[in-house]
Amino acid sequence: MSLDLNSMLKSYESATKSVRATFAAVLDADSFVELDAFITGENELGEPTGEGVVSGFASIGSKDVAVLATNPDVFDGGISALGAKKAERIISRAIESGLPLVSFIDTTGARVLEGIDALAGFDKILAGYARAYGQIPVITVVKGKCFGMLTYLSGMSDAFICYEKAEVATTSPLILSTSGSISCLASDIAKNAGFVTNIVKDDAECKKVIDRLVSLLNDEMADNTDDANRVCKGLSASSDVRSVLNEAFDKNSSIEMKASSAIEALTAFASLDGVPVAVVGVDGKLTAKGASKITDFITTAGSMGMPIVTLVNSTGIVADANQESCCLVRNVSDLIYAYNNVSVQRIALVMGKAVGAAYSILASRSINDFCLAWNGAYIAPFDGASAARLTEGEEIAKAKDVEAAEKKFASIYEADNSALSAARKGYLDNVILPNHTRQYLIASLRAI
């Protein structure tokens, strides 16, 4: 049945209501300009129904972006060969124009009846993402469902954002349920699997997160009114890495990624005196999952050309037989490789302790352009108590008060391995007071 232009547009807009509602809430008002609107699927009567993919250009926070969305109102967001063609075209245009790619996913997977045509379509989308990742900022948002092969976009996205009630699975949840009690909720996956970078509760929060990410990932100088010489009154020798992120970097500039996974490891984007930076932090023992989390983040920072600031308060790598037999060695090896091969400026700050591998892997002179430490920080192969038992075990055993003797020898060892001692040997560029952290980080960044 033939339709005139107005009828076609009216039918198409009606079939893409959900997508347009999301665009209206997240994108800048009236900024969306659609492309390839007439590439549409057909219903059983041969009439246009609107395609499972909507694409075009828009702006978020006055910053231009390329936009791609699957349409849950058409075959549950099932992607056809035509839909894949639209996706491939907007991805290519984003790469050519150097614009961030922002995708909104709500799909149950491929259209089964299209057979190999649908599979070939997914190949084009995955190949497009693989080309885009590392060249332009890639942000993927899951609002409803993400079932099937598009789940793998998480590994080719700088940010993989999910709404609280979103569901993510590589196959149908019905199939997964036969394998046991497995949750497909993004909020659970964020804690357990670690590929969800941010959880948002609504469109307003989603808009805020994307706006900040686009600003930071675009490697543009951010608008900044925060004094470069501001004293960080909230920092002290007992502050943790997240306190440093909040206190020392530009006010309201930071956004933590994968916050609920491997919580000993901090990964966040922020700015220092308007310069976008990637922030890595370790509080306590680093786990296999934490090492993997940091490695992925370093890869993203490297592809975006962002300087890396590493905050260290760690006693090394976790001692866990289960993790060792699984993936600990491999994940830590990958982390070492990533730090040593990323081609960006690197600054390290030892806040409390950098013991054993924590120093060598994260804070050493060999992988950092600038190395700083707080006054009172401790850098050594072992913690004081362990070193005392290893080196003075016989003397401690002979002592009338074993506990007091151990503390005595531990304190001597710690004094011999203080930050000041490391600085005298040339392993640190400076030893600073915690409340001067901001000034010295900015000065170090300017110097390199």
Labelled PLM ranges:
Residues M1-I448:
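Ligand-binding clefts of soluble mixed alpha/beta catalytic domains
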